[in-house]
Amino acid sequence: MSYLCSGQQKQRMSTPIIHLEEIRKSYFMGKHELPVLKGLSLDIFKNEYVALMGPSGSGKSTLMNIIGCLDTPTAGRYVLNNNDVSEMHDDALAEVRNKEIGFVFQQFNLLPRLTAAENVALPLVYAGMKKKERIEKAMQMLELVKLSDRSHHRPNELSGGQCQRVAIARALVNDPSLILADEPTGNLDSKTSTEIMEIFEEIYQNGNTIVVVTHEEDIANHSRRIVRLRDGVIETDKLNPLFSKAPVLS
């Protein structure tokens, strides 16, 4: 059974932004089946801030790939913002990814020859926006993450924390339905990690939906809700008692 935060029931209406129903994922080695996700069901609603946790082998990375439309389930149903993506082919999945999801990765995934502003603007190239409008929107996002003064710097001229700020700005630039962050502070020191998670809190308070995949308790404690996986199923799904900040909902 998926968790429903009683304090936000009225705002969420009845349709989750992420609906996972009896999701199964197996990998096959010859005739041998290796089940990773074993009938997992989960609902995540608009304006939620959720951390996915679990030990190595729990299935959290596989679940992240399915949520991010980077992989498809072996069985079950996945609906993302009213789009049933369970059986979509690669081209359709790519279109959904570009439109609905903003990714933040541990390794930043910035193009080394592009400036910070050009990296942020990349999703808008695929969306067909004109160059002047792309750069204007990219600068707005860099301002949001407090990095507009580094807009002309390339990744090798930025610190790890600054690169991750660029990655967050890029994730936001296309106004996605979902921000999906995979170990976003894994390559950062503790002080910079805290600064990055404070940015995620600001994004959440602005009304964005965020899912963070992490194995670190201190990172998960920045989220409102913590879902713990073990052996391919949800072990617990609870509100985080340490979280007190509410989003500003329109």
Map each language-model feature to its residues:
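ABC family nucleotide-binding domain
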Residues: P16-L229
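Conserved beta-strand-loop-alpha-helix hinge in the C-terminal portion
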Residues: V233-S250
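Cationic, low-complexity basic patches in intrinsically disordered or flexible, solvent-exposed regions
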Residues: Q9
